[in-house]
Amino acid sequence: MRGLVIKNTGSWYTVRTEDGRDIESKIKGNFRLKDIKSTNPVAVGDRVVIDINKEGTAFITEIEERKNYIIRRASNLSKQSHIIAANLDQAMLIVTVNYPITTTIFIDRFLATAEAYRVPVKLVFNKIDRYNNEDQRALECLIELYTSIGYPCSTLCARTEEGLDALKADLKDKITLLSGHSGVGKSTIINKLVPGVNLRTGDISEYHNKGMHTTTFSEMIPLPGGGYLIDTPGIKGFGTIEMADAEISHYFRELFKYSEECRFNNCTHRHEPGCAVIQAVNDGLISESRYKSYLSILDDRMESKYREEF
């Protein structure tokens, strides 16, 4: 029997079958070993085949081919990956300029990974009602930067619902991953979009200006107007994986554009003579923050810095 994985609590997966039943399912032990290097071989959004047993639960026996997915390094194992979600129409990264701060390095790592796995991304800047003049200027700069690169951006105040109607229109009839740091307001947004779902919302640590985890598992939530939201635990750091050094610049759109003019085909854009990317940074044609994010991913390969909370 075929179905869609709509929830992952760690050891159990909820599979919604084609006839509308929700079946609690597990993976057989030997299934885990079949060329799967991720900590979670099955992800929310996967289409699977299950074998239902007499107790009413099931074993997952097959994962159908994915059209795409978003992946990051596992938080506890340096050589393993964690699949955040699969078979997405789009991802929305919830960003806050403050309360808590979302760094450009975090944003760019997420965008690069989405580019690598062909997942369209929109940036949604939340909590706009809380920003002072300095925060507002930073917000405007970020929107100008990412819009110029080609990423759609929007603003939102989940608390007052300003911008919520536009968000609903963007989500209609699509499977969307909602991601971002803990504390950026994902649970509040979902509570506004799906009345009655009653996700727990968390506070911001005043000492660290970071959010507390409120979502502890991944779940696909049906939207009233059609479509699904995939809610995942808030991410502190975003360690990239499965990218060869020579490919990383391909996932930074503006770097890739200028890299075609570099003197050497294998240019890493760090120090080589005749590097068009470095020249573009010096000329102000490529943002320094984006270039630093690119270098930080290269540094991952040499110094295993993925554990830092970017």
Curated annotation (Swiss-Prot):
One of its GO terms (molecular function) is GTPase activity. This is Small ribosomal subunit biogenesis GTPase RsgA. GTP binds at N126, K127, I128, D129, G180, H181, S182, G183, V184, G185, K186, S187, T188. The keyword rRNA-binding applies. InterPro entries: G_CP_dom, NA-bd_OB-fold, P-loop_NTPase, Ribosome_biogen_GTPase_RsgA, RsgA_GTPase_dom, RsgA_N. One of its GO terms (cellular component) is cytoplasm. Keywords: Cytoplasm, GTP-binding, Hydrolase, Metal-binding, Nucleotide-binding, Ribosome biogenesis, RNA-binding, rRNA-binding, Zinc. Binds 1 zinc ion per subunit. Gene3D superfamilies: Nucleic acid-binding proteins, P-loop containing nucleotide triphosphate hydrolases, Probable gtpase engc, domain 3. Its EC number is 3.6.1.-. One of several proteins that assist in the late maturation steps of the functional core of the 30S ribosomal subunit. Helps release RbfA from mature subunits. May play a role in the assembly of ribosomal proteins into the subunit. Circularly permuted GTPase that catalyzes slow GTP hydrolysis, GTPase activity is stimulated by the 30S ribosomal subunit. It comes from Parabacteroides distasonis (strain ATCC 8503 / DSM 20701 / CIP 104284 / JCM 5825 / NCTC 11152). It is an enzyme of class 3 (hydrolase). PANTHER family: SMALL RIBOSOMAL SUBUNIT BIOGENESIS GTPASE RSGA, SMALL RIBOSOMAL SUBUNIT BIOGENESIS GTPASE RSGA 1, MITOCHONDRIAL-RELATED. CDD domains: S1_YloQ_GTPase, YjeQ_EngC. It is found in: Cytoplasm. Residues 77-238 form the CP-type G domain.
